[in-house]
Curated annotation (Swiss-Prot):
The chain crosses the membrane at residues 199-219, 236-256, 283-303, 305-325, 338-358, 386-406, 413-433. It is found in: Membrane. It is a multi-pass membrane protein. It comes from Schizosaccharomyces pombe (strain 972 / ATCC 24843) (Fission yeast). Keywords: Membrane, Signal, Transmembrane, Transmembrane helix. Its main location: membrane. This is Uncharacterized membrane protein C61.05. It comes from the Eukaryota. Residues 1-19 form the signal peptide. The lineage of its organism: Eukaryota, Fungi, Dikarya, Ascomycota, Taphrinomycotina. One of its GO terms (cellular component) is membrane.
Length: 469
């Protein structure tokens, strides 16, 4: 099941629970062992008990003589790619000495924007009614394990991602709340340590490359402010946001999946989870607008353009960040759902068509501007080929390098279909650009010096020989 609103509360819960249930609990010796005889655990400053990758946190209340604890188990699971084999699944089983039911739910960790798209596409809409009717955290945990009736369950997993098994258990009042169940994830064998070292080295190499570019542009800016273009600044900002958010998300997800449940990992992961899409897309849009307007490339960059870019980026960042978080309180049925889906599709396809328009503008300006030193003029057909090749290579690199590091799988066919749709949008943008440019040049007064210079060059006149007086 996919939901992020309750998941955020669930992950934050162990670090903010302030109740102390040990005051009235019956003291037990510290060497209490579970069924397997394992006593490896530790207690953090918030009162949560860590058993390998499983966290047990005493809650602030009790039901009769039984104490309740929240249980969280998170792991990075790699789904099996071989369809002939048995698929990946999660197995949860109560221990033999369990006396009370255990309520639970399995959550797949993903960004709010991905969940938002799923709701608009008609996926997991049944969770909306559950969220609106939730009064307690226990109401969200719809499934249960009952001793001697249904003590175990197998939950299938179809995608590689970070999964969290959450629930509430009831135990007798003892000092150490041992887990009453065992949770095991079955999938492809986890990668060796070299895989995680590769992730760290890749992120380090990208960060060093970005730092070198940023430092170079900073020195150029200090030496000569006219030597740095707005396109370079916006590109550096976008790449910095991309590397920062994805690096923290990947590293935190790997750390959480390996059992390192520190506060820093959780806070950084939640920050990148919520604000990643908004920051990255707003920075990317600013870069595209700088290219489309030609700021600092073919015309001077005025202050009003920067104000406009900042306003557009701010509005888009708010929309992408907070609009997905509104699905728990909104109803996507009826007219409101149709209108929301229409707006979202227009935003998606028009937004992803902007890069083609930016490429077209760059090549047209490169062919017409003397400042860049290009004399050859690029035809529309050649520009289209370059744009289509660029988006294909970008999608392949994105699917082959970035997404595997994030632990998710996307369809290459879907990305290619999206590329074709955005390619058509690019042609429309290019046609509108040619029309607008023709109208602009038709009614724009032409300076005399520029007109005279172009006229002299078009006539190919040779200078007259000097006459002797």
């Amino acid at each position: 099941m996919r939901i992020n609103f309750v998941l955020l509360i669930t992950l934050i819960l162990p670090w903010f629970v302030s109740g102390d249930s040990s005051e009235e609990a019956v003291d037990a010796p510290l060497d209490v062992k579970d069924d397997t005889g394992n006593k490896d655990y530790y207690k953090d400053s918030t009162g949560a008990y860590h058993f390998d990758k499983l966290i047990v946190t005493p809650l602030e209340y009790r039901d009769g003589e039984s104490w309740k604890q929240s249980v969280i188990y998170c792991d990075l699971i790699f789904a099996k790619e071989n369809k002939e084999e048995k698929g990946s699944f999660v197995k949860a089983q109560l221990k033999e000495d369990a006396e009370h039911p255990f309520i639970y739910r399995l959550l797949k960790l993903q960004t709010p924007l991905e969940t938002y798209r799923g709701f608009i596409d008609g996926k997991n809409t049944e969770i909306l009614d559950e969220i609106k009717s939730i009064n307690l955290f226990e109401d969200f945990l719809s499934e249960s394990l009952v001793p001697e009736i249904s003590p175990s369950v197998n939950i299938p997993i179809d995608e590689t991602a970070l999964y969290c098994f959450i629930g509430i258990q009831e135990t007798e009042p003892i000092r150490i709340p041992w887990p009453v169940l065992t949770v095991e994830f079955y999938g492809d064998a986890p990668p060796p340590e070299s895989y995680f070292r590769t992730i760290k080295s890749t992120l380090l190499a990208i960060s060093m490359f970005l730092g070198f570019i940023t430092l170079t542009w900073l020195l150029r800016c200090i030496k000569s402010q006219s030597g740095v273009q707005p396109a370079q600044i916006s590109l550096a900002f976008w790449v910095f946001i991309f590397v920062f958010t994805h690096s923290y998300q990947v590293y935190s997800m790997v750390a959480i999946g390996r059992g390192s449940f520190s506060t820093w990992y959780v806070v950084s992961f939640l920050f990148s989870l919520v604000f990643e899409e908004g920051l990255e897309q707003s920075a990317y849009t600013s870069f595209l607008l700088v290219l489309c307007f030609g700021l600092g490339i073919t015309k001077p960059a005025l202050v009003k353009y920067y104000v406009y870019l900042a306003f557009v980026a701010f509005v888009q960042g708010l929309f992408v960040t907070f609009a997905p978080l509104s699905y728990p309180v909104m109803s996507f049925y009826g007219v409101r759902g149709i209108l929301l889906k229409l707006i979202w599709n227009i935003y998606t396809f028009v937004y992803y068509g902007l890069p083609f328009f930016a490429v077209y503008r760059l090549y047209k300006q490169a062919g017409e501007s003397r400042k860049l030193g290009f004399e050859a003029k690029y035809s529309l057909l050649r520009t289209c080929y370059i744009a289509l090749a660029a988006v294909t290579v970008s999608n392949c690199l994105f699917l082959g390098v970035v997404r595997p590091l994030l632990g998710s799988q996307l369809s290459l066919g879907f990305q290619l279909i999206t590329s074709c749709i955005t390619f058509v949008d690019f042609l429309v943008f290019a046609f509108l650009f040619d029309c607008s440019k023709f109208v602009f040049l038709k009614y724009q007064p032409i300076p005399f010096e520029w007109y005279a210079l172009e006229s002299m060059e078009s006539l190919n006149l040779e200078p007259a020989p000097d006459r002797k007086v």
